[in-house]
Curated annotation (Swiss-Prot):
Gene3D superfamilies attached to this UniProt entry: 3.30.70.260, 3.40.50.1360
Catalytic residues, chain numbering: 112 (proton acceptor)
Protein name, as recorded: Ribose-5-phosphate isomerase A
The family this protein is said to belong to: Belongs to the ribose 5-phosphate isomerase family.
Amino acid sequence: MTVTADPVTLMKQEVGKAAAALVKSGSIVGLGTGSTTAYTIQYLGDRLKSGELTDIVGIPTSFQSEVLSKQYGVPLTTLDAVDHIDIAIDGADEVDPQKNLIKGGGAAHTREKVVDYLANQFIVVVDSGKLVDRLGSVFAVPVEVIPMAITPVTNAIKQLGGKPELRMGVKKAGPVITDQGNFVLDVRFDSIDDPVNLEKILNNIPGVLENGIFVNCADIVLVGEVKDGQPLVRQL
C-alpha cells in the first residue's frame, strides 16, 4: 500500500527543495533550524550524492541542523574556519511585509542570527500561515537570558510593557535550555510598532543574550501554500 504525504508536508518539501536549488557549487552555506529547513538539508544531501552539487560546506545553527547534516551527508565547518558565508537558509515564525522576522520557536535564534546576518544572501523558507501584517500578531518574541538574570530581565521586560513567560520543556521537566545553556522568555507585546527599535532595547537589557526579532536581513522569502490540494511555492 502506498502512503501519500499530506499536502502540508508536501508543501514544506517543495519549499525546502526550492531553497536547496538556489545553492551553487563551492558555496559556504548557513543551515537553519526547523521542519522546513530540514527538507532543505535533505535535498542538499541529495544534490551532493547525485553529483549535481559539489564542494559545499555547511555551518549549522543548532544541534538539530548539525545532526541532520551528518545524516544526509552535508559536510560541515565552523565560523572559525571561514571568512564569509555565501548563502543562509532558515525558517521563521512570522514574516511581515518588510520581510522582518520573528524567529526562535526552536530556541536556536541566537546562533541563527549570527549566521543569517553574516550571509551574503539570506533565504527564508516559510508556509503562508507565517505571513503577518505586523510582527507579534501571533507569535511571541523569544528572548534568550542567562539563568542568573532571569528575574531582573523579567522585571525589565514588564516595565517595557511586555508579558514574559518562561518557556517550559516538552517531555522534559523544567524550562527549555538552549544550546548555549540559557533560558528563553517568550514575550508578548500588545503591539510591535517599531521592531528595529524593540530589537535594540531588548538586547540592551543586562542578562539578555539575544532576541528573536530579525530586521533588515532577509533577501528572499520563499512561501509555501496549498491550493486546491496542491503544494505551491511563491517568492516575496
